Amino acid sequence: MLLGDHVFVGPHATLLGCTVEAACYVATGATILQGAILGTGAVVAVGALVHANTVVPSEYFVPPNTIAVGDPLRVYSPGNEQLPDAIRSASFARTAFGVRTAWEDRVTRYRDGAEVRAQEFGSHLEDDILDAGPER
């Protein structure tokens, strides 16, 4: 993940493997997924989702509780009938997990993604904790 200068990230926002250029505002509860790019001065409002591999242009405002997908960018409301096809085009499973399972085979795709994540976490099983933080 890359964060530019003067970026504000609100409480409970999630940023995963994305690029956030300078002077962006990521509001409370917003989510920015892997491979997404927020251009300089972009705003992602409360509860909005910027999907994988999406490019949000500089100074663009992603409205609250919407889903931004693609390059060029399109913004969808949660109930939009075109949203599933837009999400499929974002290639989230491939970008986030390296999984290339067919979109229609949802169970296998989710299982494959969970296996990848479990292996990533498992690779840290023997890590040494350098600082456990304050005593509780």
List each language-model region with its residue ranges.
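Surface-exposed loop/turn motifs in large extracellular/passenger domains
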Residues: 1-2
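Short HxH-centered metal-ligating active-site micro-motif
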Residues: 8
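Glycine-rich hexapeptide-repeat left-handed beta-helix
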Residues: 11-12, 19-21, 25-135
